C-alpha cells in the first residue's frame, strides 16, 4: 500500500515503498506510480547508515523526512536503502556492502534523477549517515572516474561519518 504525504498547497502525493530499486525505477519511468512530486524540482536523498534492515531504513527515512520538513524543506525526499544490517561484530561485511551499493546510488542519481527526471546538479542534495557516507562518497568517486571534472550533485552533508581517514 502506498503511503501519502500532504503538500502545502493541499495536494496529496504518493510515497510508495519499493522492495527493489528496479521496481522504483520502472514505475517512476513509466508513470505508473512513483515517489516524486513532479511539481517540485529539488531532490534530497537520504542514505542511512549501518545497522538498518529495510524496515529500519523506512523508519529512519521517515524520521529524517519529518525533521527536514519541519526545518522548512518542501522538495522531494528520497530514502536510498542498502544492505547495512549484517550485524556486529561483522562490520567488515557492511563495509563491503557499502562499496557494492555505491554503483547503484550512482545509477539512481545519474539515470533516474538527471536523465529521466531532468534534474540538474543544483537540484540534488544528499544526506548520509554513518557508513552510508561510504556509499555516497564512493558513488561520487565513481562519477569522477567516469566523467572527470563534472558534478553529480550540489551538496552532501555527512552525518557521523563511519569511514576511515585514509579514504581521502
Language model: regions and residue ranges:
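Gly/Ala-rich beta-loop-alpha elbow adjacent to hydrolase catalytic centers
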Residues: 105, 128-132, 136
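Short glycine-enriched nucleophile-adjacent loop
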Residues: 133-146
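Flexible, membrane-associating and regulatory peripheral segments of lipid-active enzymes
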Residues: 1-78, 82-89, 93-96, 100, ...
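Extracytoplasmic/secreted cell-surface and envelope-processing proteins
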Residues: 54-56, 87-90, 134-137, 165-168
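Alpha/beta-hydrolase fold nucleophile elbow
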Residues: 117-130
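Active-site nucleophile loop of the alpha/beta-hydrolase fold
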Residues: 157-165
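The conserved beta1-alpha1 loop
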Residues: 45-49, 129, 160
